[in-house]
């Protein structure tokens, strides 16, 4: 069955809106959690790395949040995608639509949370005597689209495989924690010894974080990093959709697809 783009967009909006309402139902702070949660983590890491370990990085608060906020978008999307099909089982059983929209809606929801953190970045830029750049106007959409593609590729793989391998959740949690420390979020990439430089070279998440940091802190677009983000994102999406389509017959028997 073929679907037009208008229908898919409307469907994406409806599912994303539903997920937002479910998440913040009976929550006193509501959408403020989208800012409070990453900001709290930033305060903890600032205390540990700047005040205790005395990491010598200029404007460390801005440095930290420009890496941590985009990371939260990716990590939350990847983690929540594990149960995205299971959480939407009732909709899947009752409605005919492309099931791949479900993990995409989760990525978009976390992307909206990320957008809510950009004003926080702006405030800290002014606090440290820095200002937003005009390049943000086209730079934010450019990098954000790349991150959507990349994160969707990861999410469709996780959400599909988790229906068959429930232990995947534990491997994903460990993997995300490992990648967090292998990605220059808390530290600068030039602090890594040369013999370990491959950690940055072969880590597409590093390209993602450094793309955002260059834009927010310097007002520049690093097209090398952005190209890596898009390239790996497209590959992951193609692989993810291939896995999804190959397992669709099995998913149909489980009423999940």
Model regions: which residues?
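Hydrophobic transmembrane alpha-helices and immediately adjacent juxtamembrane helices
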Residues: 1-257
């Amino acid at each position: 069955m073929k679907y037009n783009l208008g229908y898919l967009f409307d469907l994406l909006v409806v599912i994303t809106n539903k997920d937002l309402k479910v998440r913040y139902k009976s929550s006193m702070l509501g959408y403020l959690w989208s800012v409070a949660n990453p900001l709290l983590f930033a305060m903890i890491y600032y205390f540990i790395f700047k005040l205790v370990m005395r990491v010598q990085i200029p404007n460390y608060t801005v440095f930290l949040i420009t890496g941590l906020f985009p990371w939260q978008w990716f990590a939350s999307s990847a983690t929540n995608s594990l149960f995205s099909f299971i959480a939407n089982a009732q909709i899947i059983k009752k409605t005919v639509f492309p099931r791949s929209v479900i993990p995409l809606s989760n990525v978009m929801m976390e992307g909206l949370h990320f957008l809510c953190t950009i004003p926080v970045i702006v405030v800290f830029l002014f606090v440290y005597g820095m200002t937003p750049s005009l390049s943000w106007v086209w730079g934010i959409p450019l990098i954000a689209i790349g991150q959507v593609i990349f994160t969707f590729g990861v999410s469709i793989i996780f959400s599909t495989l988790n229906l068959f391998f429930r232990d995947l959740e534990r491997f994903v949690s460990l993997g995300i924690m490992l990648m967090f420390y292998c990605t220059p979020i808390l530290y600068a990439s030039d602090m890594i010894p040369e013999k370990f430089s491959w950690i940055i070279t072969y880590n597409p998440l590093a390209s993602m974080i450094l793309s955002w940091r260059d834009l927010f802190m310097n007002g520049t677009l690093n097209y090398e990093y952005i190209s890596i983000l898009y390239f790996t994102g497209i590959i992951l999406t193609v692989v993810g959709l291939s896995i999804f389509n190959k397992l669709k017959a099995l998913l149909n028997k489980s009423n999940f697809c």
